[in-house]
């Protein structure tokens, strides 16, 4: 609804015409005392529209306001060189858009409806379970699909980690960027060690999870701890000097292993006790059911100043489950 209203406000600013509401024939008398409110029954042409304000009320008592200001006031703040550069780019963009619109009109394809899913049926659960899966467009046909190379193996796990960190950096606080980069470098080094620097490895699944420690407070929730951590995990965390870090790292590891296993989820509130992260001599070790056809799951937890990244790589196979992580 807000997007619909925003489009209308932009049209008002562009056309300098206030639209009519011919159905507003019973305005509450209490509103008639507000002299700054106007409910026109016919379109009103004005000389200029300098700004507008849009208010949207959503479900759950959540709402927002948008203030739109006429472009000329923005352009007036730009240096001449910056304005000229912008003018060149916007002219080029407009010409490209005009050509695309004309082509769509002539081919009767303004709205392109795809009559099939962008993924194969056997890949559906992998797509939905992988937060890093991305759709791509076929330049020749204009159809959309998921790249099977991106979801059926982990040869590009380093690229996937890079995309995740890049996305988190956009949302991170300025003072958290260095810690995120530190954790990413540590995770990258572990991946290089596990893959031996090869461009592809004999893997089938991957799970990556990132936790912002400044926003993590689940360790204070006893119900959360009871539902998601085993007795051994709780004992380990409560013996740690930093219980928050201990619970956060185990939780990130559980999430990464869960994504790696590609098991059918029971919902966002499902307990995670079925996956246990225990401490071994060399690295954290995960214990979980053999439902994903994996012989081994390699797991790493990398720490930054105020965040941590867990990476789980699943090794395909039908042999005895090692799960030496």
Curated annotation (Swiss-Prot):
Its EC number is 2.3.1.86, 1.1.1.100, 2.3.1.41. Disulfide bonds: none annotated. One of its GO terms (biological process) is fatty acid biosynthetic process. Signal peptide: none annotated. Keywords: Fatty acid biosynthesis, Fatty acid metabolism, Lipid biosynthesis, Lipid metabolism, Magnesium, Metal-binding, Multifunctional enzyme, NADP, Oxidoreductase, Phosphopantetheine, Phosphoprotein, Transferase. Pathway: Mycotoxin biosynthesis. GO terms for molecular function: 3-oxoacyl-[acyl-carrier-protein] reductase (NADPH) activity; 3-oxoacyl-[acyl-carrier-protein] synthase activity; fatty-acyl-CoA synthase activity; holo-[acyl-carrier-protein] synthase activity; magnesium ion binding. Pfam families: ACPS (PF01648). Mg(2+) binds at residues 209, 302. The keyword Lipid metabolism applies. [Alpha(6)beta(6)] hexamers of two multifunctional subunits (alpha and beta). Belongs to the thiolase-like superfamily. Fungal fatty acid synthetase subunit alpha family. This is Fatty acid synthase alpha subunit hexA. It comes from Dothistroma septosporum. The lineage of its organism: Eukaryota, Fungi, Dikarya, Ascomycota, Pezizomycotina.
């Amino acid at each position: 609804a807000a997007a619909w209203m925003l489009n209308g406000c932009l049209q008002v600013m562009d056309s300098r015409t206030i639209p009519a509401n011919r159905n507003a024939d019973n305005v509450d008398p209490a509103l008639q005392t507000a002299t700054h409110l106007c409910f026109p029954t016919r379109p009103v042409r004005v000389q200029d529209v300098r700004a507008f304000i849009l208010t949207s009320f959503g479900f759950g008592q959540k709402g927002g306001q948008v203030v739109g200001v006429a472009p000329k006031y923005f352009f007036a703040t730009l240096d001449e060189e910056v304005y000229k550069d912008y003018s060149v780019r916007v002219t080029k963009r407009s010409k490209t858009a005009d050509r695309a619109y004309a082509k769509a009109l002539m081919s009767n394809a303004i709205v392109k409806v795809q009559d099939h899913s962008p993924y194969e049926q056997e890949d559906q659960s992998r797509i939905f379970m992988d937060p890093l899966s991305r759709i791509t467009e076929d330049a020749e046909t204009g159809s959309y699909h998921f790249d099977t190379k991106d979801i059926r193996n982990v040869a590009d796990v380093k690229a996937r980690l890079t995309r995740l960190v890049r996305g988190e950096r956009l949302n991170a606080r300025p003072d958290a960027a260095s810690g995120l980069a530190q954790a990413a470098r540590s995770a990258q080094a572990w991946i290089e060690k596990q893959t031996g620097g090869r461009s592809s490895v004999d893997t089938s699944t991957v799970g990556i999870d990132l936790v912002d420690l400044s926003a993590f407070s689940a360790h204070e929730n006893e119900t959360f701890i009871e539902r998601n951590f085993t007795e051994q995990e709780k004992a380990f965390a409560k013996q740690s000097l930093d219980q928050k870090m201990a619970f956060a790292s185990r939780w990130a590891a559980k999430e990464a292993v869960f994504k790696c296993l590609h098991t059918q989820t029971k919902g966002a509130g499902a307990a995670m006790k079925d996956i246990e992260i225990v401490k071994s001599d060399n690295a954290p070790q995960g214990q979980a059911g053999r439902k994903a056809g994996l012989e081994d799951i390699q797991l790493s937890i990398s720490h930054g100043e105020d965040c941590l990244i867990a990476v789980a790589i699943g090794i395909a196979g039908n042999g005895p489950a090692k799960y030496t992580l």
